[in-house]
Amino acid sequence: MATERVIVQRPVFEQLLSAIKQQLSTLNVGDPETSELSSLFTEDNADKVVAMVKEAKEAGAEVILGDVKKAGPALLKPHILIGVKPETRLWQRESFGPVLVLAVVDTVDEAVELANASDYSLVASLWTKDVYNAVNVAMRIRSGVWFYLVCPFGWPYFISLHGRFGEHQWLHDPRRR
C-alpha cells in the first residue's frame, strides 16, 4: 500500500513535512540490485505521473521534493507536493507513482471535505490520540477500508510482530515460549 494523499492539521504540518522529506530524499532510485525505489511498470506510466505532477504545478501546486522529470526510462525520484488543488488529476486520481501530496487543514470539517473531494479512496488511515475522534471522522469519509493509528503508544498491546519496543523485544518475550 502506498499513500498518495496526506491531509494534515496545520500545527504538525512542518514537523511532518520535514520528517517525510528527510526520509524520501535519501532513497536510492534505480537498479533493483542497489536501489530502494525501482522503476514504474512502464515508461508510459512514468510519463503519465510526470504529466500529472506538471499539471498540478501549473495549477499552483508547489513541488517540495522532486524535479518533475524522469530519472530514467521508467524511473521517477520521489516527489512531495503541497497546495494541490482538488480539481487536478493528481488529487482526483491515483498516480501510482512515487508522489505524495500533502494538504494542510485547520479543521476536521475541512479535512473531511478534502478527503471526499476525490472519488478514489480504497484505503484511508487516521493518526490521532483520540480513538473516538477517529471513529467520528471515519463515519464521514468515504473509503473502502479504514485503519486507525492511535498515537503515541500509550497502551500495553503489541503492534504487529515487532511490538512497542522492536523485534528484539518480541523475540525474547517470555510469553512467546
Provide a role label for each language-model segment.
Residues 1-8:
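Active-site PLP-lysine loop of aminotransferase-like
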Residues 4, 35-37, 54, 132-135, ...:
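Juxtamembrane/interface motifs at transmembrane-helix termini
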Residues 7, 62-65, 125, 147:
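Structured core elements
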Residues 10-120:
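NAD(P)-dependent aldehyde/semialdehyde dehydrogenase
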Residues 75-177:
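Conserved C-terminal structural/oligomerization subdomain of aldehyde/semialdehyde dehydrogenase
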